[in-house]
Curated annotation (Swiss-Prot):
ATP binds at S14, L15, G16, K17, G18, I19, D71, R240, D241, A242. Homotetramer. The active site is at C381 (nucleophile), H508, E510. Its EC number is 6.3.4.2. UTP binds at S13, K188, T189, K190, P191, T192, Q193, K224. HAMAP family: PyrG (MF_01227). It catalyses: UTP + L-glutamine + ATP + H2O = CTP + L-glutamate + ADP + phosphate + 2 H(+); L-glutamine + H2O = L-glutamate + NH4(+); UTP + NH4(+) + ATP = CTP + ADP + phosphate + 2 H(+). CTP binds at S13, D148, I149, E150, K188, T189, K190, P191, T192, Q193, K224. This is CTP synthase.
Length: 530
């Protein structure tokens, strides 16, 4: 029978619940178990696809085209599994499905209520995560903190799961804060005690406490927490601030968290072989070289807006034993007068995805600087579209080349809306989303980056595409279309062969990068800076 691990948080947000869930998933996977992870987000939006990056951070896209929370990126990078639509569920999605069923008459005239209809739908999503992946263990993280009004239906559903599947088949892990007060020179357990009290008031007794802390928790304090929170002392696990997020699996393993979970489930599994992970960490902590990358984007004020791009750049650096230092640069601030001064000294330039008209001219100036000065350049999604426009304006002589996203009535729209996107009423969930094949042109830098495969699979999130009316003209001027859809209708990758590295992709390669398996384009990009 499938086992269920529920991860909740208390005291404050951003304690690292997602990293704890992902780290435990990695430990259990390395013990030979099939693991999947999901997150429940208590906001009313159906998904984060229409939310501002300043509000939510990056929108992570899964193979099946689901727009999800950025924590799913952590999950995939840690457990190296591709997740699906059941791995991210919001309050909006739950209520939408319940209301759809009610409209179809599937509740047979019953009064639709939070209990049982909403909680049953939540439990159904937990079960579907198990059945669609045939997993031995499902790890479910609940967003927010205990005490939030929005989280109550999810916590009630978790409480009911104990009766539905049996106490021996589910375990509750609660992450809390054990703050260190410098003025007093001591750590405080009261926030943890009150958080557990709140959780128990809802009907959930945690089995494990993961305590976020700056310093090691002394044994006497560990015993105190165990006594007041009614857990075993070995179930009080500290999660200290670490040099790298990839330290956390080993920190948790050294405290026996995976053993405790399996013992609770009465499961036996081989000891986790963490050799590859340990070797990777050794590389991360002993990087010798340094490369400086300029990330020219629109949402740089929030680091989480480009978290997968930043991680993918670091992953690529590990291959070359190099610490990749990423400097975010606001594209709005770049002008003709300051572009050279702003970008001088960088080993590479990357322009990631985005939407809208703000900052586009600064991106185009940055791309022009990279092309003319032979600075390695990688464009992603919007970065590919702006690279096409820059080439058209400054090489092909189409000085008014633009994008239909900003100027829908312009004469020379190098980038235009996809034909199947023109008459859509809804914005949410209607873009070209998910995994699609890309046919590579032999002999290109792009094909070389992917070990000369003829076709690759990549994740997408876009509504606009390269306008094929200009393909022949730009080809004549030296632009190479290195990747297309298999039917040759959609341009996926462009490159300039004369440059050391000038490649731009419509897809999002960052979503498939792993710390121990860097994505091909990122690896080639960093390689070109060596």
């Amino acid at each position: 029978m499938t086992k269920y691990v529920f991860v909740t948080g208390g005291v404050v947000s951003s304690l690292g619940k997602g990293i704890v869930a992902a780290s435990l998933g990695r430990l259990l996977k390395n013990r030979g178990l099939k693991v999947t992870i999901q997150k429940f987000d208590p906001y009313i939006n159906v998904d984060p696809g229409t939310m501002s990056p300043y509000q939510h951070g990056e929108v992570f896209v899964t193979d099946d085209g689901t727009e999800t929370d950025l924590d799913l990126g952590h999950y995939e990078r840690f457990i190296d599994n591709n997740l699906n639509k059941y791995s991210n569920v919001t309050t909006g999605k739950i209520y939408s499905e319940v209301l759809r069923k009610e409209r179809k008459g599937e509740y047979l005239g019953a009064t639709v209520q939070v209990i049982p209809h909403i909680t049953n739908m939540i439990k159904e999503k937990i079960m579907r995560a198990a059945t669609t992946t045939d997993s031995d263990i499902v790890i479910t993280e609940i967003g927010g903190t205990v005490g939030d009004i929005e989280s109550l239906p999810f916590l009630e559903a978790l409480r009911q799961m104990k009766a539905d599947v049996g106490a021996e088949n589910c375990i509750y892990i609660h992450t809390t804060l054990v703050p260190y007060l410098k003025a007093a020179g001591e750590m405080k357990t009261k926030p943890t005690q009150h958080s557990v009290k709140e959780l128990r008031g809802i009907g959930i007794q945690p089995n494990v406490l993961v305590c976020r802390t700056e310093k090691a928790i002394p044994d006497d304090m560990r015993n105190k927490i165990a006594q007041f929170c009614d857990v075993e002392p070995e179930a009080v696990v500290e999660s200290r601030d670490a040099e790298s997020i990839y330290d956390i699996p080993l920190l948790l393993k050294n405290q026996g968290l995976d053993d405790f979970v399996l013992n609770h489930f009465k499961m036996t599994a081989p000891e986790a072989d963490m050799t590859e992970w340990i070797d990777m960490l050794h590389t991360i902590k002993n990087l010798e070289g340094t490369k400086k990358i300029a990330l020219v984007g629109k949402y740089i004020e929030l680091q989480d807006a480009y978290i997968s791009v930043n991680e993918a750049l670091r992953h690529a650096g590990y291959v070359y034993n190099t610490d990749v230092k990423v400097t975010p640069i606001q594209s709005e601030d770049i002008t003709k007068e300051n572009v050279a001064e702003t970008l001088a000294g960088f080993d590479g330039i990357i322009v990631p995805g985005g939407f809208g008209d703000r900052g586009l001219e600064g991106m185009i100036l940055s791309i022009q600087y990279a092309r003319e000065n032979d600075v390695p350049y990688l464009g992603i999604c919007l970065g590919m579209q702006m690279a096409s426009i820059e080439f058209a304006r400054n090489v092909a002589g189409i000085t008014d080349a633009t994008t239909g996203e900003v100027h829908p009535d312009a004469e020379h729209k190098l980038i235009d809306i996809m034909s199947d996107q023109k008459d859509l009423e809804n914005m949410g969930g209607t873009q070209r989303l998910g995994l699609y094949p890309c046919k590579l042109k032999p002999g290109t830098k792009t094909a070389e980056a992917y070990d000369n495969q003829s076709v690759i699979q990549q994740r997408h999130r876009h509504r606009y595409e390269f306008n094929n009316e200009y393909r022949d003209l730009l080809t004549d001027k030296g632009l190479v279309f290195a990747g297309t859809s298999p039917d040759n209708r959609l341009v996926e990758v462009i490159e300039i062969p004369e440059n050391k590295f000038f490649v731009a992709a419509q897809y999002h390669p960052e979503f498939l990068s792993r710390p121990n398996k860097p994505e091909g384009l990122f690896k080639a990009f960093i390689g070109a800076t060596m």
